[in-house]
Each structure stands twice: as C-alpha cells, then as structure tokens.
Amino acid sequence: METVNTTARLTTLRSLMKENGVDIYGIIVPSEDSHASEYIAPCDGRRAFISGFTGSAGTAVVTQDKAALATDGRYFNQAGKQLDGNWHLLKTGLQDVPTWQDWTAEASAGGKTVGVDPSLISSPIAEKLDESIKKSGGAGLKAVSENLVDPVWGSDRPARSSNPVKLLIGKYSGKDTAAKLTELRKELEKKKAAAFVLSMLDEVAWLFNLRGSDITYNPVFYSYAIVTQDSATLYVDVSKLDDESRSYLDQNKVTIKPYDTLFEDAKALASAAEAKGTSEAPRKYFVSNKGSWALKLALGGDKFVEEVRSPVGDAKAVKNDTELEGMRQCHIRDGVALIQFFAWLEDQLVNKKAVLDEVAAADQLEALRSKQTDFVGLSFDTISSTGPNAAVIHYKPEPGACSIIDPEAIYLCDSGAQFLDGTTDVTRTLHFGTPTAEQKKAYTLVLKGNIALDTAIFPKGTTGYAIDCLARQFLWASSPFSTKQGLDYRHGTGHGVGSYLNVHEGPIGIGTRKQYAEVALAAGNVLSIEPGFYEDGSYGIRIENLAMVREVKTEHSFGDKPFLGFEHVTMVPYCRKLIDEALLTAEEREWLNQSNKEIREKMAGRFDGDQLTQAWLERETQPF
C-alpha cells in the first residue's frame, strides 16, 4: 500500500478555500458521489485523491492548518499505512476518539465557517453538523456549489462513464415497472405525498428494470427519477438508452429527460408549490433520508420536503419469487467456480510448489467465474489475502505490490460476482499447510457463530440488531460455562444484498449500527452472514454465506406471529483442516454434515472429467 505525498494538493485546496466567494476555514470531503453511493466511479473519488486513502468508507476534513481522515474499523490498518504525515487518523467507534463531526465542530470554534459540496452530503447530516458547528462557536456550515477538489485534481480527474444502459427482462426481474409504480403510488397516497424523488442509483435501476455499468462492480447508471400519481420521469443521459430500453419505458408510461435537468425540474416543483398557496398543509415531496442537501434545497427545504426511509429501497429489499430463485441458481454456479478455484490453488501450492501471488490467484478465480452462464462481472474487488494481509479486513492486493501466497499461512478469499439472475458474495478462509491450534480454535469459534445465526429462528418484527450477538457469542465466550474468550470483530455481521444490483444493499443488515435496530427483517430479504476474527500482523478469519429470510413452521405461534429463519444459498464447503471438532456440539456436526451433503448433491455432475476438483470436493465434504 503506497503512501501519497499530499502536501501540494492540500496547499492548493487551502488557497481555493480563501478565495472571494468561498472564504471558508475548513472543508469536508465525503467519500460519496451525488447519489450517496458507497462504491463510486473513479471521477468521484475526491476523498481518495485529496487524502491518499483508498478505502471505500471515510470522510476527510481539511482546515487551513489541519487535516483529518475518519474511517471505521475495517480500514484502521489500511489508513495507517496510506496516510502521510499531513493527516490525523480518526478511528471511528473507538473510545475517546471524536467523530469527524465533533472534530470539525471543535476546529470551527471562534466564528469560523466550514464548507461542503451540498450534492455530496445528506441533508440530515448537513443540518445536524451546522447545528454542532454553531454550538461550538463556529459560524456554521456553508453550501459550496462549486466543488473545490475538482480544480486541484485538474485534467488528471477521470471522465464520467458513457456506458450503455440495458433492459433487465422479466425472466430475471420478475415484475414489470408498471406494477412497481402502482405499488409505489399506493404508498405515496397512503402517506399523502405529492411525489417521490429518487436519487439512489440502485433504486432507480430496480424501479425501471434497467442496468448499467457507470460504477465498477455495480450495475447502475447515473440517474434520478420523479414519480407522482400521474407521471414517472427518468433523468438519464438519453444517448445511453438502446431501442429496447426506450420501447420498454414507453410501454410502462415513463418519460425520459436529460440527467442534468433534474435540479431545474426540482426547483420548478418548489416554485409551483409556493405559487399554489393553499390554506391547507401542502402535500410534501418525499426524498430519501440519504438524499443530498442540494436536492432538498432545490425542492424548497423543510417547507416542501419530507425525508423518509425510501419506500423504493424497502420494496427492493424484499425479493420476489423470481429473484429468490435466481439467487439460488447463481450461487450454485458461483459455487462451481469457487470449488474449482480452491482445488486448483491447493494443487498449485502444495503439489506443484508453484509461486503464486495474491493477484494471480484472484485473476484465476475471475477467469473460472467468467465461464459460468449469465456471468456479467465481479461484484467487488476480490480480497485475496495471505498471512498478515488477511488481518486487513478490506485488503486489496495490487499487481506488483502484493504478497506471495504462503501455503503455511492462513489464506482468506472474499469475493463475489454479478450474474443476470443475482449477486454473490462469499468468504472462505483456508490453510494449505498445518494450522496452529490457535488458528483452528479461532476458525471454529467463528464457524460456530456462523452456524448459530444460520439456524436462528425469530419472530416476525425482529431486527438484525437484535440477532447480531448470536454470531459473536462464541468469540465472547466459548460457552456460558467455559472459557471467557473476550474476542470480537470490528465490522457488521451481515449486510443486505441486491438482485443483480449492489452487493451492499440497505436498509436491512445485521450488526450494531443504529439503522439495523430500526428496520425489521422480512421474508424475502437476502443478507450476508459473515462473522470473523483478526489478529493484526498475523492472520485473519472470516466465513461468509448469503442467506434468504423465510417463514418457518413452528410448533407454536406465540401472539399469532409467524416466525422467520434463514435459508443459506452459498454452496462452498468450509476448510476442514481448520475445524477443531472437539469444540463442536453434536448438533453443529450434524448441521455441517447436512450442509456438505447439500453441496455434494447440487454439484453432482458439474465436474465430470475434472478429477482434481471432484477429489477436493469429496475430501472437504466427508461426514464428521
């Protein structure tokens, strides 16, 4: 991981901050684009450019004399290596470490003004930060419409994609746009909303059954939409749409307008509402609570705007039967590629004594995946990590700067793919030599947590926040009556996953984030289950499956509530030599045996003639 000298960049940025018309003491540089995307296109990587830190999550704050970068536990190690001496690392979530918001407010004391590009920050965060700055003695938060990082970046800034947008046919989507619009309009009428303005790219893609490739690994395209009771307007670069997409949108009564006209139309909506001047409380324009501050300002602010959890996001998170079956099928094909890969990798390292680096291994896995039916591409950068690199939770191997895979060390592979019928995300941790007793114990405690959550049964209305501890319990203590381990991991246990959409999908998830306590899990949700353990500088372990939430039959029905459970769809065995059978209960061994039996059955006939892979699969799935 390379450290970038940011001195010249910061000097230029600070100069721009002092210019007439701007005149700010500090500036916030978020990770997101104008659509609050977690993963962004290269042209939107402003925070990475100005700080040198390339992780996917983080916020930079630059003042005239200081600079800070805040990120979460997944990236502490990486940020520590990439940030140069100009930067102070704020380790989010650690005791006595201020949030970036508190750090900014404190730095603004004495009547100072802090600026931000309003299109890159959500209005709830912006408004709360403005209050905090003023309470700390600062002048407040200023919307700076011209992004100040862009001129620092200059001609080196990548151009925005002009990739085509394609229709996702009903065979894969399971529901047409007209039906989705009808359901959305019912929700809007129920809540007396005048319109819903969509700004999240995956929500627009899902609603209109379109897919693009403007952001690497995410099949989305730059777009907005406005839906009222009588109209639906898609704002997109019209030249990207082919005849099939245009015809489909026309059939579903969708108007197409240029992407850049959204804010003009938003201001027109605000003007129309102002002119209406009714004595009754006006129906408001609904926007996502992740929507940008710029969008809210354009729509007239609090007078005409209500920020809500997106009804489109909620609907998208509950997959229909076609999407669920697609998830099952694409995970079988994905499992074929992964099993072939692990068998190949072991043969190369152990039998052929080959020298392979982490990138070469990741490239081989991608090549195997690409042979599977309906493969589109990867769903994120493959984390191919050996030894101490596996302790870096979101490690990214770089060509020419990565490690040689050590067969006597832990190897962690977190990878996923986009298929026309679904999205995959799976992590397996392996050892090709002789693991230590400590490594086997850690792996088995993580596995026990994975099994505990996979087999959990819970009443409808339960949140991911409430069941997070099931996956961590064995790291905390092996059992209630034995050794208190005192171990844990610094990431969520699970995230929602899209259907041929973003690999990280809200609003549901499993973990300690506040949002996971606000949204109940529902039948049709698809989530990851991925507990882990990381020994910095030594090794890392993570075991990740994707699972669907489904109704389960129970002997009783307390309070007439249905009960829910999980159906895992990942079809890849666990690393047998890392499992300490002495730590497993009889029930856990039986669960493993049933899981291995299912994998063998679903892989039957898929490796004909490939004796190496078949032998590896049979060995790894032998009964305990």
Swiss-Prot record:
On whether Magnesium is a keyword of this UniProt record, the answer is no
The biological processes this protein is annotated with in GO are:
proteolysis
Any one Gene Ontology cellular component term annotated for this protein = cytoplasm
The catalysed reaction is: Release of any N-terminal amino acid, including proline, that is linked to proline, even from a dipeptide or tripeptide
Q: Where does Mn(2+) 1 bind?
A: D425, E530, E544
What cofactors are annotated for this protein?
Mn(2+)
Query: Could you confirm whether the keyword Glycoprotein appears in this record?
Result: no
Provide the residue positions that the database annotates as binding Mn(2+) 2. D414, D425, E544
Alphabetically sorted, this entry's keywords are:
Aminopeptidase, Hydrolase, Manganese, Metal-binding, Metalloprotease, Protease
Q: What is its EC number?
A: 3.4.11.9
What note does UniProt attach to the cofactor annotation? Binds 2 manganese ions per subunit.
A UniProt-annotated Pfam family: Peptidase_M24_C
A Gene Ontology molecular function term of the record? metalloaminopeptidase activity
Q: What is the purpose of this protein?
A: Catalyzes the removal of a penultimate prolyl residue from the N-termini of peptides.
**PANTHER family membership:** XAA-PRO AMINOPEPTIDASE 1
Q: Which family does it belong to?
A: Belongs to the peptidase M24B family.
Protein name (record): Probable Xaa-Pro aminopeptidase P
- This protein's species is Chaetomium globosum (strain ATCC 6205 / CBS 148.51 / DSM 1962 / NBRC 6347 / NRRL 1970)
